[in-house]
C-alpha cells in the first residue's frame, strides 16, 4: 500500500471490532493512515449524489451478495438497511424456478447466462433463450426455449424482497427528506442495477424517478 493514506469501504453497521480489524490489516500492509467509508456513502459519492447538502439522497446498491439501501443527508446516513439478496440470489432463484416449473437441472453459469440474455424485471420483448440442462425425471439432456416472461417469473421472488426493502426505507425516512426524494428519486448502483427494466419496476412500485448510475 506504499505508506499512503487509504480510503476503504466497510459494510454499513459494521461493529467496532470489524472496523478495527480492517484498519489494522491496512496498517499492517503498509498504509500510513486509513479512512473508513461506509459502502452506501461510497456508492453515493461514486454516483455523484449531493450527500453533503441538506437534502435527502437515496441509493440502492445491488451487489453480488447483498443489497445496501440507504438514505443520506448532510454527509451521513439517516437510514440504512442491508438485504442478503442480490445478484447471486437472482441466479439461485432461476435455478429453483427451472427445477420446480420445468423439471430441469441447470448450473450457476447457465443461470447467470439466462439472467444476462433474457433476464428482466418487466417483460418487454419477444426475446427467447434456448436453455440446456438435465431432465430431473429421465436424467437425460434436454433443451427448453425460455421467454422473457419465464425469466421475469423466475426472478420476481428476489425482486419482491428488494422492493420490500426499498419500501421499508421510504417508510422510515423523515418527512422532510421524503419530500426531497419525490424530486430527486433514487439511484441504483452495483451489478444488479444492470438487470433489464429493474429501474422501471422500482419506479412503478414506489412512484419515484429512478436513475441507474
Positions of predicted regions on the chain:
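ABC ATPase A-loop
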Residues: 1
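Conserved Rossmann-like nucleotide-cofactor binding loop
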Residues: 65
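Nucleotide/phosphate-binding catalytic cleft detector across ATP-hydrolyzing
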Residues: 4-7, 11-62, 70-186, 193-213
